[in-house]
Amino acid sequence: NAEKTVIRDITIRNSAYWTIHLIGCYDALIDGISLLNNLKIRNGDGIDVDHSKKVRIANCFIESGDDCICLKNRREFEEYGSCEDIVVTNCVMTSRSCAIKIGSENMDKIDNVLFNNCIIKNSNRGIGIQNRDEGTVSNVIFSNILVDCMFYSDVWWGKAEPIYVTSYPRAVGNHKDA
């Protein structure tokens, strides 16, 4: 239930798991940060926006072994409601998984999202929308995005797809992100 949260002008290096995880936040700003994670670490996400509203991420540089920026609604935090009114702008990202991801954990609504003026370089997958659970994804705009993908290895998620979209249901009993 944090309101008016600001994370600005910091550098974080070599996070072993999700670096910044906003849960149930309202009116958050992440601006001018650098996240320099090891590109060989799985699940080393950069920024995860989870059940949060009115979030702006701007002017960031993110290197991550997993998702650089991920919007989601995880089951264990459903009391915080949906993820909506998100703006990501002027960011540069490199990932061995998916630089920009919506899902795959989505038990609620992800709505009114803008990704604008971003560069994705040397990533195994550029943009991914993985709506594998009962939630919905709507009103998402990608504008002025440069995507440069490279295939790295079968051990990483993705095969150098600039854009990947799936609504294939998660396996019964599997509630883990994949």
Residue ranges and their predicted role:
Residues N1-A178:
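Extracellular/periplasmic carbohydrate-active domains that bind, remodel
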